[in-house]
Amino acid sequence: MKKHIPEATQLLIVALLFGIRLSGAAQQPTTDSIATPDNELEGVSVIGYRKINTGNIHKQIFELEAKGVPKGASADRALRYVPGLLMGSAGYSILGSEQVAQVLIDGAPASPEELASLPAQSIWRIEVLRGGVDGDRINIRRLRSLTREFKGRIDLGLSQPARYSASANLTLQTPTTVLTFVPSALWSRQEISSQLDRKSAGVAHGWHHQTTTKTKQASSLLRFDFFPSKHWDNTLVAMYSRNGHDGFSESTQDVLPSQRLDETGYMQILQGHLASRYKWGESFLRLRGHLASEWDRQELSLQTATHEAENTYRSLTGDLTYQTKLEGRAGRHKLNTSYALTHRETRSSYSPQRYKSLIHALKLGDEVSWGEQWGGDFLLDMQYDEQRLSTLTRRAWYFLPYASLYYSGARDAVELSYDLSVSRPTGEIVDPTRYYTSDTEYTEGNASIANERTHTLALRYQRQVKQTFLSTAFTYTRTLDAIGRIHALADPQLETWANVGRSTAYALSLGVNSSFFKHKMNLNLGTALGYVTKEIAPEHRLTALSAGGSGPFYRGTLNLSYTTSRDWTYTIYAQWSGRELTFSYQRDHLPYVYFEVNKSFLDDRLSLTLSLLNPWGTMRTDTRYFFRDVMQTRWVTNNHSSGVRLGLTYSFGKRFRTRQGNETIEQTDRKGK
């Protein structure tokens, strides 16, 4: 016989966790959506609700239930409830993988503004796809309306210290089309203080740096989805954003006159994406095109006690990507092939040279299954790379294999995989000319730099135990000819790109996702602990200000939420990262934590959120540069990130039902896309 925990006891436990007294009565929410099967992916997982069928361990589907997710939550917030995802400063990554996963909405790249405005209630399911032809991806599938429907939401945010934001998501849906418009605006003021301690000729010098920056950002996104038949779907996305900043920094030094640097500038980005997929039987053909252009303009004005200087920097970058993919089945084999062409061109006032990059990639893959439980995934990525500057041309061929073997049981799954990847230097890195990143600091490129190669061997295991989803991974990573910037010992303000050395890393990752109290409380924890060794190349050991060495590292995220029957939701979110060891420095971070309370009104149309951001006061980083194990430079940065945020979300919509004669209206008017 199951034991029932009284709600008063549940609330007492939550009050001890949050330091807040709660009250409410039990109630189970409902949903009006159905999930239709998709032959592309096998295995369905449900967050904290029903039995999880792990299926293919590196291709999983999670259906997001409304229980535990705050009313008015957006898609980026919903991703924090997905098992096995880690959130970092660069974006989301899948547990046991070092690369940043690409986030998609219905197969098309998603911008941060679109993720922040897409309602979580519009999500049908979340697909976590690791490895394979397209790398790590997180694909958010939206619900599609079977009737005509107009809906939207407006988000307003106010934070202290000064930060104001506004965004909207307006969607018009029909059975064959979806039109979405997402405008957003942001204004903020940020203060960062830094303390630099540097040794020169055995004498220590101090330098205090204070930066104040005002940011104005505006963007708009238009997305059009068209489904002429159940076999053919198309997506067109256009986005424009402008990010302007205006700020100044003041520096006080022990041995040099104080100085003030005024900086103004803006960045404009224009992107377009087109995707089309046609499916017949067990096969489908997918075509994708991506066009992007970026303008960057910076104006610097330096004032010291002895002189004044002004500089203006401009850069223009264009990207063009085309991809086609064909997939089909033959017995136990699922064969796929894809071709991609990527062209990138950059012009910059930093350098008189124009940079061009052209990459042709042909990928051949095979997914094979042996019975119901055993399977494998094999991929060969053949690439031709051409990089051009006005003074040099680099050409190279690459053959990059990927392979995995997996076993999937009723409640558990295990996988062993191997991957070889190559990181290419950009135009800024191979450009041998020198350009200044500030009035005093400058960087030199390296025309003879080699590509960085990374070998990864991983063992992963997942298991479902009642309402708890466990995932673990052990990874071994070996990087050769690592690309990085090194500081010259004779001139610490000069940074030079080089193949600085090689590294070896071992990491053990653990993920826990569990629900309690009839799914009103949800815990999602992901963490990684490892040990890394950095070996400086012999030619840099005596001439560079480098750290190298070895040591442990750790990182992780925690999302703990509790929802009462009266639609109060309490959330604790934490993100931490331990010592970061690179070839040139060691860096320590303070953790970032915030507490949030959410309440919905007016039949869930209005949602209010109150957040306490980072009560420790600052996001602090402590960076140290060494030479022969003796610290030469220490840079401590304090980003004043504590504060309070008040958010308001208003949702609205209207459904237009259409029928002929005495045709009955089905109770379910929505289905998965």
Language-model segments: residues:
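Outer membrane beta-barrel strand-and-loop segments of large Gram-negative receptors
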Residues: 315-319, 361-363, 444-446, 450, ...
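Surface-exposed extracellular loop regions of Gram-negative outer-membrane beta-barrel proteins
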Residues: 136-137, 141-154, 243, 248, 386, 407-455, 476-494, 616-629, ...
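N-terminal periplasmic accessory domains that precede
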Residues: 43, 75-78, 91-93, 113, ...
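Periplasmic plug
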Residues: 86-131
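Short, acidic, small-residue-rich periplasmic hinge/interaction motif at the N-terminus
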Residues: 28-68, 89, 130-132, 142-144
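Outer-membrane beta-barrel translocator/receptor signature
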Residues: 134-138, 146-194, 215-218
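Flexible loop and strand-edge segments within Gram-negative outer membrane beta-barrel domains
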Residues: 188-317, 355-359, 434-437, 619-622, ...
